[in-house]
Amino acid sequence: LSRYQCKVCVLEREEDVCCGTSKANSAIIHAGYDAEPGSWKARLNVRGNEMIESLSRELDFPFRRDGSLVLCLDEKAYPDLKKLYDRGIENGVEELQILNRDEVLSMEPNVSDKVYAALYAPTAGIVCPFHMTIAFAENAYTNGVSFHFNTEVQQIEREAKGWKITTGKGEYNAKCIVNAAGVYADKIHNMVSEKK
């Protein structure tokens, strides 16, 4: 958002970025095979995967494209694996493959010898969540985003031209709100939506 002609501020309940959900994630950059085809999640997952390598170079955070394996341990589970493959193809995931037992064991010898097959997604990778989040925040700050730390949102009210956000440190007005509250996203959602 900081690259657009708009004024952005981040209200962060913690003392710094990367103190909540961001620090506790798995660090995996998913290929995009698991999201429902046609969904926003599917589109953004695949697009984010495509962008991450150049972002890591531009913002100087570590990224490794190691690929991922989804293991199938018996023939009975194979249709579920095939469903993930089909979803991935429909979502536009490149280079996706289903590997047989021998191919899996050749690629990853420490996998259980009971493996039947695996979905291999070479475009998956890993990042350091701390470095990445801090790099994004530093870039946003450089582009004019203001950060307000130790500022927990307590209430959000609709106004004629946007929203009034009440925090423990005062009130803010906004034309729009991006809910990036991690595990507390439901609380922010419930402040503005009739659907709980």
Name each region found by the language model.
Residues K187-K196:
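Glycine-rich beta-alpha-beta "Rossmann" dinucleotide-binding loop(s) and their flanking helix/strand
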Residues A27-M107, Y116:
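Dinucleotide-binding Rossmann-like beta1-alpha1 core, especially the glycine-rich loop
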Residues E12, R65, N100-R101, F149-T151, ...:
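Short loop/edge segments at beta-strand edges and connector loops
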Residues L119-C176, A180, Y184-K187:
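Helical element adjacent to the flavin cofactor pocket in flavoenzyme catalytic cores
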Residues S2-A24:
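Glycine-rich FAD pyrophosphate-binding loop
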Residues A24, K76, E108-V115, E157-K164:
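A short, glycine/Asx- and small/polar-enriched loop/turn
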Residues C6-V8, E95-L96, I177:
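Hydrophobic anchor at the start of a short beta-strand
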